[in-house]
């Protein structure tokens, strides 16, 4: 059975002039030709529950899957507008992502993934996002 390896991630997102940087512990594992990185989202407040995010990094496609209090799925493939969804205790909606850039550079369990996309909620443009995900295998793993 393959081992989950501890990694550190740095997630940098830019949207509407706002920069958000998160540095989080995570775990990574290769399954087939894809790298899976799992981490727990920081809780927004005392009433918020846990949400675990899995990032599936393929050769030319990226998928974000969230489970827990928030459930969502987004898929990113260069030049493609792909469907997704968002569900929380407070709201549900269908969305899609139109990926303008996707750059995947991996070396084993470490690497950088950068992508930009336009988000559509119910087919209405909702915003432009630029994301950078750095993955670094923990020393001594």
Model-derived regions: residue spans:
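N-terminal intrinsically disordered, cationic/polar leader segments
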Residues: 1-114, 118-120, 124-126, 138-141
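A short acidic/small-residue loop/turn micro-motif
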Residues: 133-135
